[in-house]
Amino acid sequence: MDLLPFLLDANLSATNPPAIPHWWKRQPLIPNLLSQELKNYLKLNAKEKNVQIADQVIIDESAGEVVIGANTRICHGAVIQGPVVIGANCLIGNYAFIRPGTIISNGVKIGFATEIKNAVIEAEATIGPQCFIADSVVANQAYLGAQVRTSNHRLDEQPVSVRTPEGIIATGCDKLGCYIGKRSRLGVQVIILPGRIISPNTQLGPRVIVERNLPSGTYSLRQELIRTGD
C-alpha cells in the first residue's frame, strides 16, 4: 500500500490524478487523524507491538505525537521529533535523526546518522548511513547508498518549481526536495537538486548529480584516471 495518496490534499484524489504525484501538497501530519485503514496497515494499534527502543534514544513529542508500529527497532542514540509516524518492522539506525512531518512505511531501514525531515518513505525502502532526505518522497523498495543528499533549497532563495508532463509547476515552496521512484537504486554520494523527479527502476552510479528529471535507465559518471609521478 502506498502512503502518499492518503496524505495528499483532498482535491488531488480526483479520478484523473496527475502523472507525477504533487508530493509537495501533503496535508499536515497529525498521527491520530490518519485513516483507520492506514493505522491498521502500519500496525500502529497492534495489541502486542513489541517495539524495541534502545538506551539513549530521544523521543520529543513537544510539537507532535510520535507513533511507532509493531516490531520496529529504534537503535542507540536516535532522535525522533514529532509529529512522526513509523510503521511496522522498521529499523532506525544508531544516531538517526527523524524530524517533524516524516511518515515511514513498513519494512523500512534507516542507516547510521541519517537525517530525514518532512518526508514520506514508502514500504521496504532502504536508506544508507549519513544521508539527508528532506521534503521528499522515497518510493517503495528504493535503495539509497551512503551519503545520498536531497537538496531542498535554492541558492537564489526563489521558490522551487517542478517540471512534470503537464508542464512546469510553480509550487510556491521555499523548501522542496525530490521524488525518487519505485525500485530505484542510488549509489554513494548521489546529490539530487530541488524539485527533481527520478523515474522508477532507475540506477544511478556513485556521485551522480541529478540536475534534471531522469527517465528510467542506468546512469554513471565517466571517469578519467591519469597516472602521474613516473
Swiss-Prot record:
Transmembrane segments: none annotated. One of its GO terms (molecular function) is acyltransferase activity. InterPro entries: GlmU-like (IPR050065), Hexapep (IPR001451), Trimer_LpxA-like_sf (IPR011004). It holds the Pfam family Hexapep. The keyword Endoplasmic reticulum does not apply. Keywords: Acyltransferase, Repeat, Transferase. Its EC number is 2.3.1.-. It is an enzyme of class 2 (transferase). It comes from the Bacteria. PANTHER family: N-ACETYLMURAMATE ALPHA-1-PHOSPHATE URIDYLYLTRANSFERASE, NUCLEOTIDYL TRANSFERASE. This is Uncharacterized acetyltransferase YaiX.
